[in-house]
C-alpha cells in the first residue's frame, strides 16, 4: 500500500516544494509555504490517466479533441452580453456580462460582496430563464432571510419549487444551492444549464479527489480550473467570490487571477457608506474602471452622479481647498483636495496623506520649496481627498500644489475653478490624458474656469474658460492672485504673470 507524502505549496505563486523553506525559492515570498498531504497513487494506477479520472469524477465531459482552425474558420456565435440590471456593474464589466466569462470578485469581509451578487441574481432572474446561486457559507434559509431583509425576494409557492432546491425568485428563475462539494455543484450546473451562476465563495469549496483542506492552494487551483472548463464549454457566465488576505490581495495562488477573465475588487471605507467596484483585469473591457454604490438599509444602490458624492459644498469654501477632475478608467470624477499646512511641534515635521500617494506629496513639497521658495520643510503638511476616494494618477499634482500653497497663505481658491496638470521635477506643467472628458464633467457641475497645461491646445472647452499655464508658479499666480480683491481670477496671460513675478524660474 502506497504511503501518503507531504509537500509544501506556496500560497503566493502555487509552486510545490518537497521541504519547508522560510522563503519561497521561486517567488521569494516570506512565510508563504503551507503543508499539504498528498495521497500517493497506487502501483496499478495509470499516471497518464489521473487527470482524466478527475474529470470523470467531477462530471466534466472533456469531449473529442478539436482540430486547429484558421482565424477565418472560427464561427462567431451571435451571443450578446447580459445586462445585470445595475449600470455601474455593467460599466465595470465593459458593457455587460459576457456569456461563458469567469468573473472573480474580492473584497474585505462585510464590504457587501454577497449582498451585491444576491441583488444581481434577483435582477438577472427577471431577464433570464435560469440563474443559480451556490452558497458555500450560508444555508438556503439564511439566504432567504437576508433577501427578505433587503426587500428583494418574491417567494413562489412551495409546490412550484423543484425538489431539493430553494426557489426564491420571481417566476422561479433563481435557484439556490447550499453546497461545498465541487462534484455536486458541477453536476447541478450540467443539469440546470443556467445562463449565469454565482459561487460564494471559492475558498470554501473542496474537490473530493484531493486530500488537502478547503481553501488550500491545490483546492483553490483545481476547483477554479474545473469551473472554468465547464463555463467555457457550456457558455455559463460564472461569478466567483474570493476572500482577501490582510494585505488586501485575493487569497490563494496568483494563478487564480490568471485563470479568470475578469478580476474585480469591491472596496470601501468602514466609516463611509459608499463602495467602489474596481476592475484590475478584464479581457472584455477596460481595466481600472470603477462603479460606485452606496450601502443603505435596503442594500446597495447605484450612485448615478458620483461627482456630487466626492465634492463638498462650494458655498463655504475654506482655505487650502482645490477642485480637480480625476479619471478612473474612462470615468471622470470631480474631487475635492483638502490641504492643511501648520507649524510643527516636533523636531521632524509630519507628512500625512489620505487618498493620495504619500511619495507624490513629498515630491510636490520638494518642487514647491526648490522652484518657488515656499518654506514648507519645517511645517506639518496634511493632504486628503474628500469622500474617501483614492486617487493615484499624476493629473492631480497641480491641484495638490495649489491646495498646499493656499493653506500656507491662508487663501481661498475660486470655487468655480478646476485645476488640472502633472508637475515635473523642474516645475513645469505636463499634459494630462482625457482632458476633454474631464472638462465636460466639470461643465455639468457648473464650473466656469479651468487651469490646464499650456501644451494641450485644440480641445473642446465645453463652455469652460481655459487658462493654459506652463509653470507651477504661473498656475499659483492665477489661482491665488496677489490682489485679493480681484474678482475675475485668471484674466492675465502667462507672459504677463511671468513679468509680474520677475520671470522666476
From Swiss-Prot:
Which SMART domains does this UniProt record tie to the protein?
A: AAA
Q: Which residues form a coiled coil?
A: none
Please give the residue ranges the record annotates as the region Disordered: 485-505
Zinc finger (C4-type) in chain: 10-27
Skewed-composition ranges (Basic and acidic residues): 495-505
Residue span of region Lon-protease-like: 380-505
GO MF annotations, alphabetized: ATP binding; ATP hydrolysis activity; ATP-dependent DNA damage sensor activity; damaged DNA binding; zinc ion binding
Any idea which positions bind ATP?
A: 107-114
Keywords in UniProt for this one? ATP-binding, DNA damage, DNA repair, DNA-binding, Hydrolase, Metal-binding, Nucleotide-binding, Stress response, Zinc, Zinc-finger
EC number of this enzyme = 3.6.4.-
Name the SUPFAM superfamilies for this protein.
Answer: P-loop containing nucleoside triphosphate hydrolases (SSF52540), Ribosomal protein S5 domain 2-like (SSF54211)
* Superkingdom field: Bacteria
**Annotated Pfam families:** AAA_25, ChlI, Zn_ribbon_LapB
Location of motif RadA KNRFG motif in this chain is 281-285
Family classification: Belongs to the RecA family. RadA subfamily.
Briefly state the protein's biological role: DNA-dependent ATPase involved in processing of recombination intermediates, plays a role in repairing DNA breaks. Stimulates the branch migration of RecA-mediated strand transfer reactions, allowing the 3' invading strand to extend heteroduplex DNA faster. Binds ssDNA in the presence of ADP but not other nucleotides, has ATPase activity that is stimulated by ssDNA and various branched DNA structures, but inhibited by SSB. Does not have RecA's homology-searching function.
Q: Which protein is depicted?
A: DNA repair protein RadA
Q: What is the lineage of its organism?
A: Bacteria, Bacillati, Cyanobacteriota, Cyanophyceae, Synechococcales
Amino acid at each position: 500500500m502506497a504511503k501518503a507524502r507531504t509537500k509544501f505549496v506556496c500560497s503566493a505563486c502555487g509552486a510545490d516544494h518537497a521541504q519547508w523553506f522560510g522563503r519561497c525559492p521561486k517567488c521569494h515570498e516570506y512565510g508563504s509555504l503551507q503543508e499539504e498531504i498528498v495521497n500517493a497513487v497506487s502501483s496499478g494506477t495509470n499516471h497518464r490517466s489521473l487527470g482524466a479520472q478527475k474529470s470523470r469524477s467531477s462530471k466534466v465531459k472533456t469531449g473529442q479533441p478539436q482540430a486547429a482552425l484558421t482565424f477565418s474558420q472560427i464561427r462567431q456565435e451571435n451571443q450578446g452580453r447580459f445586462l445585470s440590471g445595475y449600470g455601474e456593474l455593467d460599466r465595470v464589466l465593459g458593457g455587460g456580462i459576457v456569456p461563458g466569462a469567469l468573473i472573480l470578485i474580492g473584497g474585505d469581509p462585510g464590504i457587501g460582496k454577497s449582498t451585491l451578487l444576491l441583488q444581481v441574481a434577483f435582477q438577472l432572474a427577471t431577464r433570464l430563464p435560469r440563474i443559480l446561486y451556490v452558497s458555500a457559507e450560508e444555508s438556503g434559509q439564511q439566504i432567504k432571510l437576508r433577501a427578505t431583509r433587503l426587500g428583494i425576494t418574491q417567494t413562489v409557492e412551495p409546490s412550484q419549487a423543484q425538489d431539493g432546491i430553494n426557489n426564491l425568485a420571481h417566476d422561479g428563475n433563481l435557484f439556490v444551492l447550499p453546497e461545498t462539494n465541487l462534484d455536486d455543484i458541477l453536476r447541478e450546473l450540467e443539469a440546470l444549464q443556467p445562463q449565469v451562476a454565482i459561487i460564494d465563495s471559492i475558498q470554501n469549496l473542496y474537490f473530493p479527489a484531493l486530500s488537502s483542506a478547503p481553501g488550500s492552494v491545490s483546492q483553490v487551483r483545481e476547483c477554479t480550473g474545473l469551473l472554468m472548463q465547464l463555463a467555457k464549454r457550456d457558455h455559463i457566465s460564472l461569478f466567483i467570490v474570493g476572500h482577501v488576505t490582510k494585505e488586501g490581495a485575493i487569497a490563494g495562488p496568483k494563478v487564480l487571477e490568471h485563470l479568470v477573465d475578469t478580476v474585480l475588487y469591491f472596496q470601501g471605507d468602514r466609516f463611509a457608506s459608499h463602495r467602489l467596484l474596481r476592475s484590475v483585469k478584464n479581457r472584455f473591457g477596460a481595466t481600472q474602471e470603477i462603479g460606485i454604490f452606496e450601502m443603505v438599509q435596503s442594500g446597495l444602490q447605484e450612485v448615478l452622479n458620483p461627482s456630487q458624492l466626492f465634492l463638498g459644498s462650494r458655498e463655504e469654501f475654506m482655505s487650502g481647498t482645490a477642485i480637480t477632475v480625476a479619471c478612473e478608467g474612462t470615468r471622470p470624477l470631480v474631487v475635492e483636495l483638502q490641504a492643511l499646512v501648520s507649524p510643527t511641534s516636533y523636531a521632524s515635521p509630519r507628512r500625512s496623506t489620505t487618498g493620495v500617494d504619500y511619495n507624490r506629496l513629498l515630491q510636490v513639497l520638494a518642487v514647491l520649496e526648490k522652484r518657488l521658495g515656499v518654506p514648507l520643510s519645517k511645517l506639518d503638511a496634511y493632504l486628503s481627498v474628500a469622500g474617501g476616494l483614492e486617487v493615484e494618477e499624476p493629473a492631480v499634482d497641480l491641484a495638490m500644489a495649489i491646495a498646499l500653497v493656499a493653506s500656507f497663505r491662508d487663501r481661498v481658491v475660486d470655487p468655480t475653478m478646476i485645476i488640472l496638470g502633472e508637475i515635473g521635477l523642474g516645475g513645469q506643467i505636463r499634459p494630462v490624458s482625457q482632458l476633454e472628458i474631464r472638462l465636460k464633467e466639470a461643465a455639468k457641475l457648473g464650473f466656469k474656469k479651468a487651469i490646464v497645461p499650456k501644451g494641450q491646445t485644440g480641445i473642446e472647452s465645453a463652455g469652460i474658460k481655459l487658462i493654459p499655464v506652463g509653470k507651477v508658479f504661473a498656475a499659483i499666480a492665477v489661482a491665488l492672485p496677489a490682489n485679493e480683491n480681484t474678482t475675475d481670477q485668471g484674466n492675465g496671460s502667462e507672459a504677463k504673470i511671468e513679468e509680474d513675478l520677475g520671470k522666476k524660474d
